[in-house]
């Protein structure tokens, strides 16, 4: 998926700059959203790492603790080209915790460990706190204005390019799989390709709503989501005025679909809009139905929390904010500047 074809909320940026000139320019700290139990058969280990990806560290932890790799879990993937603080979960029923003071892996540091009753699963994460350094910015006045707009109105909640693989290859392979041109046996690859398919369709519908200047306008039959919640309800025609007020106040979010094997969830005008957007996606929709993927909804717009910024000099900006799990920091950066190093990997979830 070409991210340059997606609509901007605040218009295409005038400035360009560099994100992740070095790993220390992209710092991510996981927010579990809960306090560990302090007891139980699982051991939570918080690690600061750079230069190694999540699965590599998980496998190394398994060898260190002398347990099967399947007994080490985590809440989400983090890129190796960044400094990240991430929780890992070791299942140790009836076993003593390993001596983590002797844990040595280049680029990794154990920060703490604590017992937990429940397994840490993919997605069981409240969010991530980001601290970024943007360098070589060409128009700091435009960037400053955009930061003010983002703080007030947010950004499109697009899935970042990482979701689609290098060069969009996950989406290419998903289409080949949909047309029975390739067979996909590995469970992880099937998951990647299905995720890329659904994410691409979400981005497409969200971009079209933005292009029609309807990303904040409630349509009859829209699926509306309480801010910070996953549940949603359908907008009735006789309640549009009241619901619009609640959207304007930030209480409700307008959503777009992550299509599944059931209905999209919208009705009336909103359903017609989404069906029109997906008219050319029949092969991916058929694949998702064939694989019996459960549908979901996701807010079209995202407002970064605790956003703050500091200009180190005229061309260098430090930016910090918090995003809910599954949202992409580079979707925020995309509204600020054009990346000179657009191949820089994304980090989320």
Curated annotation (Swiss-Prot):
Assigned protein family: Belongs to the pseudouridine synthase TruD family.
One of the protein's GO biological processes: tRNA pseudouridine synthesis
Superkingdom assignment: Bacteria
Protein name: tRNA pseudouridine synthase D
Binding site for substrate: 26, 128, 328
GO molecular function, one term: RNA binding
Catalytic reactions on record: uridine(13) in tRNA = pseudouridine(13) in tRNA
Species annotation: Yersinia enterocolitica serotype O:8 / biotype 1B (strain NCTC 13174 / 8081)
Gene (UniProt): truD
């Amino acid at each position: 998926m070409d991210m340059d074809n997606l609509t901007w909320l605040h218009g295409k940026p005038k400035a360009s700059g560099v994100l992740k000139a070095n790993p220390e320019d992209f710092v991510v700290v996981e927010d579990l959203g809960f306090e560990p139990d302090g007891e139980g058969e699982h051991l939570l280990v918080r690690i600061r790492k750079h230069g190694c990806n999540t699965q590599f560290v998980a496998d190394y932890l398994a060898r260190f603790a002398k347990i099967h790799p399947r007994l080490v879990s985590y809440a989400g993937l983090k890129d190796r080209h960044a400094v990240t603080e991430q929780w890992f979960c070791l299942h140790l029923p009836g076993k003593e915790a390993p001596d983590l003071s002797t844990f040595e892996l280049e680029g990794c540091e154990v920060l703490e460990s604590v017992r937990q009753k429940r397994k840490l699963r993919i997605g069981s994460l409240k969010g991530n706190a980001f601290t970024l350094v943007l360098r070589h910015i060409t128009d700091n006045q435009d960037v400053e204005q955009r930061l003010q707009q983002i703080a007030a109105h947010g950004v499109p909640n697009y899935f970042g390019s990482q979701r689609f693989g290098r060069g969009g290859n996950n989406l290419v392979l998903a289409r080949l799989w949909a047309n029975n041109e390739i067979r996909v046996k590995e469970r992880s690859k099937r998951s990647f390709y299905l995720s890329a398919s659904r994410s691409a369709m979400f981005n497409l519908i969200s971009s079209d709503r933005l292009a029609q200047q309807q990303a904040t306008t409630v349509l009859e039959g829209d699926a509306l989501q309480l801010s910070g919640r996953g549940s949603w309800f359908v907008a009735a025609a006789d309640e549009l005025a009241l619901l619009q007020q609640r959207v304007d106040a930030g209480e409700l979010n307008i959503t777009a679909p992550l299509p599944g094997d059931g209905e999209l969830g919208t009705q009336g005008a909103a359903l017609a809009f989404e069906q029109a957007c997906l008219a050319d996606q029949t092969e991916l929709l058929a694949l998702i139905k064939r694989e019996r993927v459960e549908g979901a909804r996701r807010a079209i717009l995202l407002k970064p929390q605790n956003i703050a910024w500091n200009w180190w000099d005229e061309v260098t900006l430090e930016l910090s904010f918090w995003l809910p799990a599954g949202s992409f920091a580079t979707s925020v950066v995309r509204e600020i500047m054009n990346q000179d190093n657009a191949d820089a990997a994304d980090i989320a979830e």
